[in-house]
């Protein structure tokens, strides 16, 4: 039987000067147990209030991505239909379900068939078979050949239609300019969330890889891809595009015509003693509240004699009106083109920003951009500003080693990240997970009764998240009235221990280091365990804080599955230095299974790296 325990600790007011070195946790006065069922709101159901577009563009550098450990899923061969799935891509449909695509590892990972699977929750996946299946053809040379498919990519249009693309190539003709039109891109459409699909049809002809698509506010579609020139070099690329003004029914400039060339720069291949084009594997977004497009690309950097190609990450931006300046001039077979002096573009770009490959780019509605890329078999992510021009430090979250990672938005405060996981060469699959966006939140303005009942928090849904170490996870919400600042911490935990606890840290919004105005409140399953300030270390001090804890669990009993616990906390305004209606906060969850799990490491001494709470 799950039981509810309510712990209440009310510390008598004492002089702020009255403090002592922190001693053992004091615990709290026990209130008789009573049965209940707690309703704990998961992070994905919070932050539902609509913020203004780019609401956090000015403080993007304080935003933090946090792994949601519970969301980690490994999708294997039994689902994807191939023993070594590669180049995974996920698209979220209009009905809230998901499609995962991947191709097989044929020809060193270049692929022959694109497989797909569906899910309603990102956890349970249903195999759907082949979306673009390799097939026998007679090529232009009169040979028995095979049309091979690779790089599946999906996009949901504003009308709910799903467009799926795959690059194709034909054996025996791929490396020849004369037969370039036996390669290209095919598309399929679904108007019923993937239940049925149109027959594939060609939207572009010419060697290519890694197509992605954008839809602008006017409904115009732009399909970008790595344009390949294999008759010259396998490392001779650049990003080109075709476009549609009728929802993807027809594409310009038309089959058999050279594409619109939009992004490329030159590099020197010492191995072949050639100048070549680069900027491939495009990842593009239309920036919030703008028509400007920002793109990230894999760029060949150098190919030393006796070595291998080294890749880096590059960026490019369209003009503000979103219209690229096309790189004019027919190339034909390219033999008469002096690549070293050839036209490149666009003018607004950054080349060789970091070492890496296979990038992806997204933007949250609140303004933060996120770039991902691969390096040394790991996926790395960086948070950037609202123009995708400045980025913070790189961090890795996905618990996998492999290649061809990607990211996509899932709501306003989460992203999905995934990649081919080849850590175990005998069990290759796709590993995916969610990351939560922790950024500035607003306190709701209302009085909270500190009784362990979270019903008075219904209209306070700005929330922070901790939960990267194990299945135990916590959210934090804030409210305030004229007398107190309130916090609700909800902990979802399948195995609650009597020794679990949370810590809420509070600092003035202008504090650059921990000091005597930095507060900490520690709350465990028996109520308020400790409270105090920082003076070289944490000093116990009566802040007048109150806490009530309730749990829906059998404590320290692993034989069943618990729901979790919550804590309502109040801190008098008189104990908190509020600057311009703001404070800095940090949340740390200690769970016996995963240890300490904080939004920002509790070893961080600069509160400016904590999260801002406004509305105070």
Where are these regions (language model features)?
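C-terminal motif of bacterial Sec signal peptides marking the signal peptidase cleavage site
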Residues: 15-18
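Acidic/polar low-complexity flexible segments
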Residues: 440-451, 505-534, 573-616
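Bacterial signal peptide processing site
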Residues: 20-22
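Short, well-ordered beta-strand segments enriched in hydrophobic/aromatic residues
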Residues: 452, 484-492, 565-571
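Sec-dependent signal peptide recognition
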Residues: 2-9
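Beta-rich carbohydrate-recognition and catalytic domains
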Residues: 27-145, 155-207, 215-273, 286-351, ...
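Conserved positions at the start
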Residues: 85-87, 149-151, 208-211, 279-281, ...
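Extracellular/luminal beta-rich ligand-recognition
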Residues: 334-337, 495-562, 615
């Amino acid at each position: 039987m799950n039981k509810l325990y309510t712990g209440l600790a009310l510390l008598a007011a004492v002089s702020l000067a009255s403090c002592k070195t922190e001693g053992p946790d004091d615990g709290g006065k026990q209130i008789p147990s009573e049965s209940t069922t707690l309703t704990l709101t998961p992070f994905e159901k919070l932050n539902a209030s609509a913020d203004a577009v780019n609401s956090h563009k000015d403080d993007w550098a304080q935003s933090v991505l946090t792994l949601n450990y519970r969301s980690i899923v490994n999708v294997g061969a039994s689902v994807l239909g191939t023993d070594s799935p590669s180049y995974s891509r996920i698209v979220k449909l209009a009905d809230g379900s998901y499609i995962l695509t991947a191709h097989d590892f044929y020809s060193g990972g270049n692929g022959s068939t694109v497989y797909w699977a569906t899910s309603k929750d990102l956890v349970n996946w249903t195999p759907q078979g082949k979306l673009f299946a390799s097939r026998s053809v007679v090529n232009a040379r009169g040979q028995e050949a095979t049309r091979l498919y690779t790089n599946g990519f999906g996009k949901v249009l504003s009308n709910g239609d799903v467009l799926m693309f795959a690059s194709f190539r034909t054996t025996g003709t791929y490396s020849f300019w004369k037969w370039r039109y036996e390669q290209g891109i095919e598309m399929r459409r679904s108007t019923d969330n993937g239940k049925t699909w149109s027959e594939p049809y060609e939207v572009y002809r010419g060697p290519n890889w890694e197509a992605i698509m954008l839809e602008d506010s006017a409904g115009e579609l732009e399909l970008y891809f790595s344009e390949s020139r294999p008759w010259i070099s396998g490392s001779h690329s650049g990003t080109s595009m075709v476009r549609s003004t009728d929802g993807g029914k027809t594409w310009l400039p038309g089959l058999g015509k050279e594409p619109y060339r939009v992004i490329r720069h030159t590099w020197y291949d010492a191995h072949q003693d050639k100048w070549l084009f680069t900027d491939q594997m495009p990842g593009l977004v239309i920036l919030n509240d703008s028509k400007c497009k920002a793109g990230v690309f894999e760029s060949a950097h150098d190919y030393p004699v006796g070595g291998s190609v080294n890749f880096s990450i590059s960026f490019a931006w369209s003009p503000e009106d979103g219209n690229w300046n096309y790189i004019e001039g027919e190339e034909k077979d390219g033999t008469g083109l002096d690549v070293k002096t050839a036209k490149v573009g666009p003018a607004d770009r950054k080349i060789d920003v970091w070492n890496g490959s296979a990038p992806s780019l997204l933007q949250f509605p609140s303004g933060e951009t996120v770039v991902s890329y691969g390096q040394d078999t790991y996926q790395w992510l960086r948070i950037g500003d609202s123009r995708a021009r400045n980025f913070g430090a790189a961090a890795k979250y996905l618990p996998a080693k492999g290649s061809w990672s990607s990211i996509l938005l899932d709501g306003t405060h989460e992203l999905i990240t995934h990649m081919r996981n080849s850590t175990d060469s005998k069990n290759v699959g796709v590993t995916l997970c969610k990351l939560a966006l922790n950024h500035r939140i607003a306190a709701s303005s209302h009085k909270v009764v500190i009784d362990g009942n979270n019903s008075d928090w219904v209209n306070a849904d700005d929330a922070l998240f901790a939960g990267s170490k194990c299945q135990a996870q916590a959210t934090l919400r804030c409210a305030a009235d004229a007398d107190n600042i309130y916090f609700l911490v909800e902990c979802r935990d399948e195995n609650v221990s009597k020794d679990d606890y949370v810590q809420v840290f509070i600092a003035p919004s202008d504090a650059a280091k921990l000091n005597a105005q930095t507060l900490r409140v520690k709350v465990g399953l028996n109520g308020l365990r400790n409270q105090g300030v920082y003076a070289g270390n944490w000093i116990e001090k009566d802040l007048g804080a109150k806490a009530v804890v309730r749990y829906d669990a059998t404590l320290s009993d692993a034989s069943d599955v618990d729901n979790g616990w919550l804590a309502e906390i109040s801190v008098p305004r008189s104990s908190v230095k509020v600057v311009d209606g703001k404070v800095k906060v940090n949340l740390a969850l200690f769970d016996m299974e995963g240890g300490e799990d904080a939004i920002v490491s509790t070893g961080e001494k600069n509160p400016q790296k904590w999260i801002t709470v406004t509305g105070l």
